């Protein structure tokens, strides 16, 4: 059985439709392998990736390793309920990007994974 870590998106904009303000393409990765995804967010908006763990394994560390140029990315929530938040700069529309790493141990795999997030700011 392979250890899978899935990231799910939640919008933190109260009262706004989730897909209109913030949407992240679904993706899955294994510890020790890299992947990428795309986030769609409104100009000036905030989007959060909640890291959802499977029933086994553990996370050793999470860090934003490459900062966005037209917004900011941050790690919040600790190891128990980890999340990566992106806040776009108000008035900016266009492409942005950031990256973060997750280091952990699963049943069959362990290691550092880099997740690159391309951001489409509307």
Please tell me what each predicted stretch does:
Residues 87, 101-103, 118:
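Residue-level recognition of well-ordered beta-strand positions that form the cores
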Residues 83-93:
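Extracellular/luminal low-complexity segments enriched in Ser/Thr/Pro
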Residues 7-15:
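Bacterial N-terminal signal peptides
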Residues 20-59, 107-122:
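Extracellular interdomain linkers/hinges and stalk-like, low-complexity segments
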Residues 64, 75, 88, 119-121:
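Hydrophobic residues in beta-strands and at strand termini
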Residues 43-83:
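Surface-exposed or secretory-pathway low-complexity segments enriched in glycine-proline
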Residues 93-106:
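A short beta-strand micro-motif common to beta-rich folds, especially ectodomain repeats
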Residues 1-4:
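Positively charged n-region of N-terminal signal peptides that target proteins for export
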């Amino acid at each position: 059985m392979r250890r899978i870590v899935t990231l799910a998106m939640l919008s933190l904009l109260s009262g706004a439709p989730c897909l209109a303000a913030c949407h992240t393409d679904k993706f899955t990765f294994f510890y020790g392998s890299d992947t990428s995804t795309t986030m769609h967010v409104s100009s000036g908006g905030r989007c959060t990736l909640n890291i959802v763990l499977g029933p086994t394994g553990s996370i050793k560390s999470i860090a934003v390793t490459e900062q966005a140029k037209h917004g900011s990315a941050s790690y919040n929530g600790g190891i128990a309920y980890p999340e990566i938040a992106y806040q776009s700069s108000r008035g900016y529309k266009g492409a942005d990007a950031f990256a973060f790493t997750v280091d952990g141990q699963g049943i069959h795999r362990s290691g550092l994974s880099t997740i690159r997030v391309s951001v489409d700011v509307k």
